[in-house]
From Swiss-Prot:
Record PANTHER family: CATION_ACETATE SYMPORTER ACTP, SODIUM/PROLINE SYMPORTER-RELATED
Subcellular location: Cell inner membrane
Record organism: Shigella boydii serotype 4 (strain Sb227)
Name of the protein: Cation/acetate symporter ActP
GO molecular function annotation: acetate transmembrane transporter activity; glycolate transmembrane transporter activity; symporter activity
UniProt keyword annotation of Transmembrane helix present: yes
Transmembrane domains' residue ranges: 33-53, 77-97, 103-123, 148-168, 183-203, 206-226, 262-282, 303-323, 355-375, 404-424, 428-448, 464-484, 493-513
Length: 549
């Protein structure tokens, strides 16, 4: 079926970075009833799960962490579902479609952070924390200041990520389903609030698991059909792609995406350490019963995601062959209908027809819902658990804390809908880049050093953490994306698109310097408490286990 799509889907480098954002204007398309029916089936099924989960959510632990009863395998699938976004699917396959081999290099950037989580973070995080990563950071440091900093870092990351998701959701749904942009944004916001409000982490987990299974199935089918077309020969796949691509053999050469070593290093560090500082990802490690299951979670998640990113590479090259060389998918000017981000969607039509096109469109929508639900729960827990129950009203009952959490979900949902509408025609791709930079420059150094460095003090954590956060924001504003492309200045004050190399360095140096020079009695006491923390982090003695329902 030839769909008359006339959209500009310009992808900045970070737009493929889990942004789900289609930048630029889109023209509303004819209603795609196959996609809508399949999506409605998904919604009805997941709302049924939410109803089931709501009957099992009886306590704070149930709401935040599903009672710690999720298995390692289930959590691995849920983590993959939380992390693999629609733009990982559409954006990276589009990068391969346009740039060839460079798309694979970019996709690997999302994986390199997971060994760090596996070997350095997962086990100790589970043994030291209960509901949020601030539990870990404040284990032996001053509760108030550390939780405020951690919550601010979490909320900024969640807000930026959420806006990008909502705008991307509206654009994507307008493009794929033919629905009005504002209706699409409201629909995503309302469903997101329902999942989190009534089902908590249990419903969110199962939405993410179902979405991961659907996405892996859809991508596997597309890759299988592509490989079947070339006789299951990678040599034939690459040869045919090079034969029809305008760049020819150059699509097999690396180095076209990032222009200089500093940018390459900064991008790599942002992806690697940013992943290890995303609050909605870290929160998932508290849903399992113990450190062993936390390690298994990362093992399974890395396997699922690695497999998925390999599939996007095959899908991208398949799109070069079956979509790029087919005039049916081109507009009058010879450009891909809907822009390059639609390469995977057109490929779905090419290998599976209308029905499979509807399925992939519905999966893209389901993907967005799974990601925003995880983000909303992470933001709500930062407010209710870190700020309300441990800073502003110490000793609050579980019921009071849960009430604040649910009010926060409603507020976050309404804000996300409003901002999604306000940012409709804005370039929001930079927001995800900024979210990763802040996660890498504020959250990650605090988590890592609080678990591993015995000389860390509250003073060092506060000053270094705020320095990292502020540096990331300022350098991003002064860089080419915001300063030149959005604000319209001639030349960027900070020449690199990615601030992570500099902001991470500032954070670690700041934390080290201000901790090392802290000679206060409070600092000495905090250093002495490290031994007890170390024993707990290694043994899990005293950790809250999962409960049977």
């Amino acid at each position: 079926m030839k769909r008359v799509l006339t959209a500009l889907a310009a992808t900045l480098p970070f737009a493929a970075n889990a942004a789900d954002a289609i930048s630029g204007a889109v023209e509303r398309q004819p209603t795609n009833w196959q996609a809508i029916i399949m999506f409605l089936i998904f919604v009805v099924f997941t709302l049924g799960i939410t109803y089931w989960a709501s009957k099992r959510v009886r306590s704070r632990s149930d709401y935040y962490t599903a009672g710690g009863n999720i298995t390692g395998f289930q959590n691995g699938l849920a983590i993959a579902g939380d992390y693999m976004s629609a733009a990982s699917f559409l954006g990276i396959s589009a990068l391969v479609f346009t740039s060839g081999y460079d798309g694979l290099i970019y996709s690997l950037g999302f994986l390199v952070g997971w060994p760090i989580i596996l070997f350095l973070i997962a086990e100790r995080l589970r043994n030291l924390g209960r509901y949020t990563f601030a539990d870990v950071a404040s284990y032996r440091l001053k509760q108030g200041p550390i939780r405020i900093l951690s919550a601010c870092g979490s909320l900024v990351v969640v807000a930026l990520y959420l806006i990008a998701q909502m705008v991307g959701a509206g654009k994507l749904i307008e493009l794929l389903f033919g629905l009005n942009y504002h209706i699409a944004v409201v629909l995503v916001g309302v469903l997101m609030m329902m999942y989190v409000l009534f089902g908590g982490m249990l419903a969110t987990t199962w939405v993410q698991i179902i979405k991961a299974v659907l996405l892996l199935f859809g991508a596997s089918f597309m890759a299988f059909m592509v490989m079947k077309h070339v006789g299951f020969s990678f040599n034939n796949l690459f040869s045919e792609a090079m034969a029809v691509h305008p760049k020819g053999v150059d699509i097999m050469k690396p180095g076209g995406l990032v222009k200089d070593p500093i940018s390459a290093l900064s991008l790599g560090l942002g992806l690697m350490f940013g992943t290890a500082g995303l609050p909605h990802i870290l929160m998932r490690f508290f849903t399992v019963s113990d450190a062993r299951e936390a390690r298994k979670s990362v093992f399974y998640a890395t396997g699922f995601m690695g497999y998925f990113y390999i599939l996007t590479f095959i899908i991208g090259f398949g799109a070069i062959m079956l979509v790029g060389a087919n005039p049916e998918y081109k507009d009058a000017a010879g450009h891909l209908i809907g822009g390059n981000n639609m390469a995977a969607v057109h490929l779905a039509n090419a290998v599976g027809g209308n029905l499979f096109l509807g399925f992939i469109s519905a999966v893209a929508f389901a993907t967005i819902l799974a990601v925003v639900a995880g983000l909303t729960l992470a933001g709500a827990s930062a407010v209710s658990h870190d700020l309300y129950a441990n800073v502003f009203k110490k000793g609050a009952t579980e019921r009071e804390e849960l009430r604040v959490s649910k009010i926060t979900v409603l507020i976050l949902g309404v804000i996300a809908i409003i901002l999604g509408m306000l940012f409709e025609n804005q370039n929001i791709a930079f927001m995800v880049g900024l979210a990763f930079a802040i996660a890498a420059s504020c959250n990650f150094p605090i988590i890592l050093l609080s678990m591993y460095w015995s000389k860390l003090t509250t003073r060092g954590t506060m000053l270094g953490g705020w320095l990292g956060l502020i540096t990331a924001v300022v350098l991003m504003i002064l860089g080419p994306t915001i300063w030149v492309q959005i604000l319209g200045h001639e030349k960027a004050i900070f020449p690199y698109e990615y601030p992570a190399l500099f902001s991470i360095s500032v954070a670690f140096l700041g934390i080290w310097f201000f901790s090392a020079t802290d000679n206060s009695a409070e600092g000495a006491r905090e250093r002495e408490l490290f031994r007890a923390q170390f024993i707990r982090s290694q043994t899990g003695f005293g950790v809250e286990q999962g409960r049977a329902h």
